[in-house]
């Protein structure tokens, strides 16, 4: 029951933001390609600049499943880092442990990836890490604990069951799926990160 409620809530959020946050939500949006609520089918009025920027920020937050405080901290770090703030922001978020667990194909959704980390199934360079926000460094190895490898969710993942979520592994990851291992070979580039976002709108939202 809880899973069904969560799935419906995610589907509703996906429709509101105009982006599928999970494979189930994508199927739901195919059946109902309009916003949620009784006025979902009605022609939408022109959004204000603020509303457009707010929605884009919410879209990015939702794709990484993070809280506003986490997003704000990441933005402040991105702003202080040399380069384009919007690109820096997405590159920093992509180096989160839960994001890389998802990209590697160990999980089907960001929520599942976060759960695997919190439940201490994931190691970084041989050390258990239970913080989804942990920043993985270049060259570090993300892998599943040996005692967890035989669990059904990981057996399913090792067989490639989640390849439809992300058919092509990003170039910044070296993944050995059968061994449930993934190495971050270098810092991600914004152009390679598989998230839908006009990051400049996010920058403008926080700079207001």
UniProtKB/Swiss-Prot annotation:
Give GO terms for biological process: ribosomal small subunit biogenesis; translation
Per its UniProt record, what InterPro entries does this chain match?
Ribosomal_uS4, Ribosomal_uS4_bac-type, Ribosomal_uS4_CS, Ribosomal_uS4_N, S4_RNA-bd, S4_RNA-bd_sf
Gene Ontology cellular-component annotations = small ribosomal subunit
PROSITE patterns, sorted:
RIBOSOMAL_S4, S4
Tell me yes or no: is RNA-binding among this UniProt entry's keywords: yes
Taxonomy, superkingdom: Bacteria
Q: Which CDD domains match?
A: S4
Residues of the region (Disordered) are 28-48
GO terms (molecular function) for this protein are:
rRNA binding; structural constituent of ribosome
Report the residue ranges that make up the S4 RNA-binding domain in this protein.
Answer: 95-160
Its keywords, alphabetically, are: Ribonucleoprotein, Ribosomal protein, RNA-binding, rRNA-binding
Q: Which Pfam families match?
A: Ribosomal_S4, S4
Family note: Belongs to the universal ribosomal protein uS4 family.
What job does the chain carry out? One of the primary rRNA binding proteins, it binds directly to 16S rRNA where it nucleates assembly of the body of the 30S subunit.
Q: How does it assemble?
A: Part of the 30S ribosomal subunit. Contacts protein S5. The interaction surface between S4 and S5 is involved in control of translational fidelity.
* Name of the protein described by the UniProt record: Small ribosomal subunit protein uS4
């Amino acid at each position: 029951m809880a899973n069904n409620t969560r799935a419906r809530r995610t589907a509703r959020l996906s429709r509101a933001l105009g982006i599928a946050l999970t494979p189930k939500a994508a199927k739901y949006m195919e059946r109902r390609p309009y916003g949620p609520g009784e006025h979902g089918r009605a022609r939408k009025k022109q959004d204000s600049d603020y509303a457009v920027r707010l929605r884009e920020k919410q879209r990015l937050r939702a794709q990484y499943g993070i809280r506003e405080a986490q997003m704000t901290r990441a933005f402040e770090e991105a702003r202080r880092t040399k380069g384009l703030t919007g690109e820096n922001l997405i590159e920093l978020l992509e180096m989160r442990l839960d994001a890389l667990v998802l990209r590697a194909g160990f999980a089907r959704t960001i929520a599942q990836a976060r759960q695997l980390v919190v439940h201490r199934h994931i190691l970084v360079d041989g050390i258990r890490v239970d913080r989804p926000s942990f920043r993985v460094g270049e060259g570090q190895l993300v892998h599943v604990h040996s005692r967890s490898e035989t669990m059904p969710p990981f057996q399913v993942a090792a067989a490639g069951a989640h390849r439809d979520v992300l058919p092509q592994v990003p170039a910044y990851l070296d993944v050995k799926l059968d061994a449930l291992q993934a190495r971050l070979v270098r810092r991600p580039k914004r152009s390679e990160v598989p998230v839908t976002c006009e990051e400049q709108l996010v920058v403008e939202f926080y700079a207001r």
